[in-house]
Amino acid sequence: MNILFAVSECVPFVKSGGLADVAGALPKELKKLGVDVRIILPNYSLIPQKLRDGCTLHKVINVPLGWRNQYCGILKGEQDGITYYLIDNEYYFKRDSLYGHYDDGERFSYFSKAVLECIPHLDFEVDVLHSHDWHTAMVNFLLREKYQDNPLYERIKTVYTIHNLQFQGVFPPEVMYDLLELGDEYFHSKQLEFYGNVNFMKGGIIASDQITAVSPTYKEEIQYEFFGEKLDGLLRKYNDKLSGIVNGIDTSVYNPETDSYIKAQYDAESLYEKSENKRALQRYFGLPEKEDTPIISMVTRLTKQKGLDLVRTVFREIMEEDVQCIILGSGDSEYEQFFEWMAYEYPEKVKVYIGFNEELAHQVYAGSDLFLMPSLFEPCGLGQLIALAYGTIPIVRETGGLNDTVHSYDEETGEGNGFSFTNFNAHDMLHTIHRAIEFYHDKPVWEQLVKQAMTEDYSWEQSALAYKELYKSLME
């Protein structure tokens, strides 16, 4: 079974979000199941030179893009037993950021065409082409509409994964006409047209043999208007080929037993070492070293989606509790400034790190007691999974993957691995925080809750099995 992942980012090469984590970890787990997964992505100038040096030139071809042919170098390399192909074109990929350029429509039209033009020149036969998010959605669409009659492509099946429906790749019609050479028959509501523009993600949804969302709850949510980003009707139409498969975490990277970034390694039977991580975190930020004061942390993009309006509304009420708060992340200036002001107002209780620091993030996960994630929507979420693996109990809103992975503690049965609330309401969140703090001070209950969190399986194993079955169903 040969699978080609077409992605715009992938760990360890480049990362801007959770897509890169999925593209880096899922293929490794699928390989353990006997699936040959290879990955194709742009050869960005942002890729570390050491990784670029590990690739060799496999082939040079021309890619037709509208009225012209564009250079395409196919580089080939291997990392952790996985084969990678990098599409080389400095005009499109020698940039100071992955996305957000005036010509993104052209850049990813080129990449989509390049993926398809490369397939006959790769040294393996593709059974399933698996595209991800808007950046490679048109690979699947173009395969069906322009390449399917070619014997080299006719047996290839397609899967399309929606990681975040909010970002759809919407561009002027000229992209479709001039670059992709698609005529008027594609510019209507049953094809690519979307409120006067062209929508790449819509093309992926329409053309793919199977569609997955990154959690079962998110799969249901995106079929409703509130979460559907104007594509809910289309997703309801194609419900029969839509499924939800929850993401996992790479346990070779996020594992408190082996993590070299944290002060003291530990497992569910050596939680006293977790306390050492808490002290180290307090020392790092200059917080009072108070063992019985819970640390509530957030490692997040500071954006509206992450529920920060709820946090902002009741933050001073949270501060009335005996707690310490640590926020690590960057994003919208209004939230950055708010948390910096709170750190100034509560210097003994609040610390903020604007930016991202991988090593510090690991220490925050290991040293905190509670992890706050009150998202407005959350397709899957990785933060809560990492927190659970480190025995840091999540407080989440019941949406998307948060609803699938965090099960609210039930004091009657003792079951659960975290705390959750349903409505997007600041005082519902505050009540849940109070409840979590109350149980934090009941040490036997808390220790049991932490052990339950740490002993569940958050790896990619079950998800990889589900993807393998999906691929298998397409090939039968």
From Swiss-Prot:
It is an enzyme of class 2 (transferase). Its EC number is 2.4.1.21. It catalyses: [(1->4)-alpha-D-glucosyl](n) + ADP-alpha-D-glucose = [(1->4)-alpha-D-glucosyl](n+1) + ADP + H(+). Pathway: Glycan biosynthesis; glycogen biosynthesis. Keywords: Glycogen biosynthesis, Glycosyltransferase, Transferase. ADP-alpha-D-glucose binds at K15. It comes from the Bacteria. Belongs to the glycosyltransferase 1 family. Bacterial/plant glycogen synthase subfamily. This is Glycogen synthase. The gene is glgA.
